[in-house]
From Swiss-Prot:
It comes from the Archaea. This is Probable Thioredoxin. Residues 2-85 form the Glutaredoxin domain. Gene3D superfamilies: Glutaredoxin.
Length: 85
């Protein structure tokens, strides 16, 4: 099963680059086992509204917001592994 990860960011967000970096590391580690979509809320506001997001960065895994703020590498990898079980 492929784990779907959505990363919500905005151009003015100071913590978003850290969240993107951690997700990029996960993509390198997990490869085809995860599918990553990066969403700029200034461009695709509807998706953020669907999730009820009030802040970025935010990371949804398989349709559930798991992190608001940039998670550590360990936190993200653990959440991905939980979804794979």
């Amino acid at each position: 099963m492929v784990v779907n990860i959505e990363v919500f960011t905005s151009p003015t967000c100071p913590y978003c680059p850290m969240a993107i970096e951690v997700v990029d590391e996960a993509k390198k580690e997990f490869g085809d086992k995860i599918d990553v979509e990066k969403i700029d809320i200034m461009v695709d506001r509807e998706k953020a509204i669907e999730y009820g997001l009030m802040a970025v960065p935010a990371i949804a895994i398989n349709g559930v917001v798991r992190f608001v703020g940039a998670p550590s590498r360990e936190e993200l990898f653990e959440a991905i592994n939980d979804e794979m079980e």
